[in-house]
A protein has these predicted regions:
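Phosphate-backbone binding interfaces of nucleic-acid-interacting proteins
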Residues: 1-200, 332, 348-351, 355, ...
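Glycine/proline-enriched, intrinsically flexible loops and inter-domain linkers
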Residues: 5, 23, 63, 184, ...
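Short, hydrophobic beta-strand segments
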Residues: 2-8, 156-164, 215-223, 355-363, ...
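Noncatalytic alpha-helical scaffolds and linker/capping helices
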Residues: 38, 396-465
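Conserved catalytic alpha/beta cores of large enzymes that bind or transform nucleotide phosphates
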Residues: 124-125, 131, 228, 295, ...
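Conserved mixed alpha/beta core segments that line enzyme active sites in large multi-domain catalysts
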Residues: 49-77, 236-237, 254-321
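Terminal amphipathic helices with adjacent charged low-complexity linkers/tails
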Residues: 180-211, 383-413, 417-420, 459
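Conserved phosphate/anionic-ligand binding catalytic regions in large, soluble enzymes, centered on
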Residues: 2-3, 7, 82-90, 165-183, ...
């Protein structure tokens, strides 16, 4: 998993260096594979605004732009061949003397006889994305003349960790923040997921035909969305630094919540759903997936279906037919708990390993689904407008995982650790890890593990480690 150090520090910010943070995380058993800067070395790139555009006198594919944002507030003349160059947009502007990634120096030059005092940049030229279709259009409120590194908060590091299968709870910013908070006895600020009131009555029915495989399914209808709105730059940057490509607001929001909270989600085009949602085992049926491949989904695979067809491979990948697009106005958000034993191995069998399957087969917090859908709803409405219906929760409580009750004996703990730790320190550490104290007597204590720690079920040996 890749994550942005600055994103993590928004939740927990101990007074330690990047090197010390990496060492701590590694010593805690979350092996760090790589640390790299969030942006390649560059200088002299600022936020520019195109003030005027004229056709180049001697080149059909070139235009002459007057650009604000240069030194001392003066406008600079730039010759540009990007098809989206137009008046009013804000773009990265490399002034004369700038250095771009790859040791590319920007100099004053003539292009087909017209003076050019710098360069307007796209994402690929700055090595900050893979969109090579033209200029990188920045948000309208980007302050002209501001250094791009400052504006995008690029003074950051991307840290990649390799987690053991039993620590799926750390596959999110929230989970990592908990660990760092424990290691440093630092306060952790968790993202609030306040309920978003329903403003319409629209909902879908949900039927759990395989409750042992899907014990909780949470859905929410949102209507009247404008999915042509751009994903906010801050969200795109957090996704990029996590190794996730921006694909439009609906998909970006679900990916963002996955990274932030650890709950995989999916967005369906509501108009493509026939009747209600049915969570069932497959019927050896064909399904075209979001990656344009077609698979035959076998009877041992859980699917999300409607009244007439399979819509998605549960916990792995959505189907193409119900995918959202720019013209989608109404969606159904899905946030579910799938049994890890049902998902495990399926992604590999179909050759479809995804961020969602990676988390579901390791175990997702069974109490997270409603909070995640509220968080996604708030973000979606903020970006694209619209109206949300009520949250629909269908569950089979008997099939949901139960938190383990664990008894620790002080003498046994000291024997296994090889050192005696004061009971107050043990209690503090366990509380920070999310455990709840049931009782303490003279010889030890009894605790209930948090819903996100599937690994705390093996008794004293596991907890002593």
């Amino acid at each position: 998993m890749k994550f942005s150090e600055s994103w993590l520090r928004q939740s927990v910010n101990p007074s330690i260096s990047t090197a010390d943070l990496v060492a701590q995380v590694t010593m805690a058993g979350l092996e760090v594979d790589a640390v790299e800067p969030a942006a390649p070395a560059m200088s002299g790139v600022v936020v520019g605004e195109i003030m005027s555009v004229e056709q180049h006198p001697d080149a059909d594919k070139l235009r002459v732009c007057q650009v604000a944002g240069g030194k001392e507030g003066e406008q600079a003349q730039i010759v540009c061949g990007a098809p989206n160059a137009r008046v009013g947009i804000k773009v990265p502007f490399a002034v004369v003397g700038a250095k771009l990634p790859g040791d590319f120096n920007i100099k004053q030059a003539k292009l087909r006889g017209v003076e050019s005092m710098g360069m307007l940049c796209g994402q690929t030229e700055l090595k900050l994305g893979d969109d090579d279709t033209g200029l990188w259009e920045l948000p309208a409120d980007a302050p002209v003349g501001t250094d791009l590194i400052t504006y995008l908060d690029l003074d950051d590091n991307i840290i990649e960790v390799d987690l053991t299968p039993n620590r799926g709870d750390c596959l999110s910013i929230r989970g990592l923040a908990r660990e760092v908070g424990v290691l440093n006895k630092a306060a952790v600020s968790e993202q609030a997921c306040a309920p978003v009131p329903a403003t319409i009555d629209d909902s879908v029915t949900v039927t759990l035909e395989a409750p042992n495989a899907c014990a909780r399914y949470v859905g929410r209808v949102i209507r009247g969305l404008d999915l042509t709105q751009p994903t906010p730059q801050w969200m795109q940057e957090k996704l990029r630094r996590s190794g996730v490509r921006s694909l439009g607001p609906a998909v970006d929001v679900t990916n963002y919540v996955l990274l932030e909270l650890g709950q995989p989600m999916h967005a369906f085009d509501l108009s493509k759903i026939d009747g209600g949602i049915v969570v069932r085992m497959a019927r050896d049926e064909k399904l075209k997936l979001l990656d344009d491949s077609e698979v035959t989904v076998t009877a041992d695979t859980l699917v999300i279906a409607d009244q007439s067809k399979a819509l998605a491979m549960a916990g792995i990948m959505g189907g193409d037919e119900s995918a959202v697009g720019d013209d989608t106005t109404d969606i159904l958000f899905e946030s579910a708990w799938f049994n890890p034993l049902v998902i495990a191995g399926k992604a590999r069998n179909y050759g479809k390993h995804t961020d969602s399957s990676h988390r579901f087969e390791r175990g997702v917090d069974a109490q997270l689904q409603v909070a995640a859908i509220e968080r996604a709803t708030a973000l979606m409405l903020e970006i694209c407008g619209g109206n949300a219906g009520p949250v629909v929760v269908e569950e089979s409580a008997e099939h949901l995982p139960q938190s383990a009750t664990i008894t620790l004996r002080d003498n046994r703990l000291a024997q296994q650790l090889g050192v005696s730790i004061p009971a107050a320190d043990v209690d503090d550490m366990l509380v920070r890890l999310g455990l709840s104290l049931v009782e303490r007597d003279n010889g030890g204590s009894t605790w209930v593990a948090p819903s996100w720690r599937f690994d705390l079920t093996l008794g004293l040996n596991q907890n002593a480690s």
